[in-house]
Amino acid sequence: MENSEKTEVVLLACGSFNPITNMHLRLFELAKDYMNGTGKYKVIKGIISPVGDAYKKKGLISAYHRVIMAELATKNSKWVEVDTWESLQKEWTETAKVLRHHQEKLEASICDPQQNSPVLEKPGRKRKWAEQKQDISEKKSLEQTKTKGVPKVKLLCGADFLESFGVPNLWKSEDITKILGDYGLICITRAGNDAQKFIYESDVLWKHQNNIHLVNEWITNDISSTKIRRALRRGQSIRYLVPDLVEEYIEKHNLYSSESEERNVGVVLAPLQRNTTEVKA
């Protein structure tokens, strides 16, 4: 299939990235190889979208630091970048809305190829919008974009994210339907995760199974942000588990400790609080 006939895809990964790890970066590479390998798609960009502070997850440090670490991790990437829109929202933003934002941003780029992303300032200062440098090589002319059509945003995640759809009140059923029906999911499965069975046992996932791409991770990697934070609390090395620049940044700012892990303890996770309140209402 010629490139002009392939559907261009933008991979969007939402999450805490607390901190970002080498495994997060591997998800993009695995998904890109798989999607390009189908012969139907061409992955043109990857976007990392750190969640805002209003998510209220236990141990979640400031979005300012999480965004910077993600930017350091992707500094040498030619196709994966960090977007700060979600992290700047005062309230927690549903994943479906984040997907819609990026899809609309792509559509708007047809008329205005120069799209800017907000930048976080240090905690305690007023957040403001500012222009962010863009790689000139990634810009496309108006005519090229019109010819190829608007790229499709698809959500990139791990198997644990997929299985979270089954947690009561964590997701609105209509949001799951919108994510799967309007955008699609690319799920990297780990050893021990039976994602196919989970899809089979869920009516809504089964209905949209053709828009769920399961990618096997043959070279297994069990790195997680939780394990990284645990190692740091215990004074253990995280070398080769996170990008070197991220490790240096964490050490310089002493980001993770027993105290930071207690942040938001006793606070109900934002989606659970919102969805539970709406159910009662």
From Swiss-Prot:
A motif (Nuclear localization signal) lies at residues 123-129. GO terms for molecular function: ATP binding; identical protein binding; nicotinamide-nucleotide adenylyltransferase activity; nicotinate-nucleotide adenylyltransferase activity; protein ADP-ribosyltransferase-substrate adaptor activity. It comes from the Eukaryota. Activity is strongly inhibited by galotannin. Inhibited by P1-(adenosine-5')-P4-(nicotinic-acid-riboside-5')-tetraphosphate (Nap4AD). NAD(+) binds at G15, S16, F17, M23, K57, W92, T95, G158, D160, L170, W171, E217, N221. One of its GO terms (biological process) is negative regulation of DNA-templated transcription. It catalyses: beta-nicotinamide D-ribonucleotide + ATP + H(+) = diphosphate + NAD(+); nicotinate beta-D-ribonucleotide + ATP + H(+) = deamido-NAD(+) + diphosphate. Its cofactor is Zn(2+); Mg(2+). Its EC number is 2.7.7.1, 2.7.7.18. Beta-nicotinamide D-ribonucleotide binds at G15, S16, Y55, K57, W92, T95, L170, W171. Residues 113-143 are annotated as: Disordered. InterPro entries: Cyt_trans-like, Euk_NMN_adenylyltrnsfrase, NadD/NMNAT, NMNAT_euk, Rossmann-like_a/b/a_fold. Residues 129-143 have a biased composition (Basic and acidic residues). Keywords: ATP-binding, Magnesium, NAD, Nucleotide-binding, Nucleotidyltransferase, Nucleus, Phosphoprotein, Pyridine nucleotide biosynthesis, Transferase, Zinc. The modification Phosphoserine is found at S117. ATP binds at G15, S16, F17, H24, K58, G158, A159, D160, T226, K227, I228, R229. GO terms for cellular component: chromatin; nuclear body; nucleus. It is found in: Nucleus. It is an enzyme of class 2 (transferase). Divalent metal cations. Zn(2+) confers higher activity as compared to Mg(2+). Catalyzes the formation of NAD(+) from nicotinamide mononucleotide (NMN) and ATP. Can also use the deamidated form; nicotinic acid mononucleotide (NaMN) as substrate with the same efficiency. Can use triazofurin monophosphate (TrMP) as substrate. Also catalyzes the reverse reaction, i.e. the pyrophosphorolytic cleavage of NAD(+). For the pyrophosphorolytic activity, prefers NAD(+) and NaAD as substrates and degrades NADH, nicotinic acid adenine dinucleotide phosphate (NHD) and nicotinamide guanine dinucleotide (NGD) less effectively. PANTHER family: NICOTINAMIDE MONONUCLEOTIDE ADENYLYLTRANSFERASE, NICOTINAMIDE_NICOTINIC ACID MONONUCLEOTIDE ADENYLYLTRANSFERASE 1. NCBIfam families: nicotinate (nicotinamide) nucleotide adenylyltransferase. Belongs to the eukaryotic NMN adenylyltransferase family. Homohexamer. Interacts with ADPRT/PARP1. This is Nicotinamide/nicotinic acid mononucleotide adenylyltransferase 1. It comes from Bos taurus. The lineage of its organism: Eukaryota, Metazoa, Chordata, Craniata, Vertebrata.
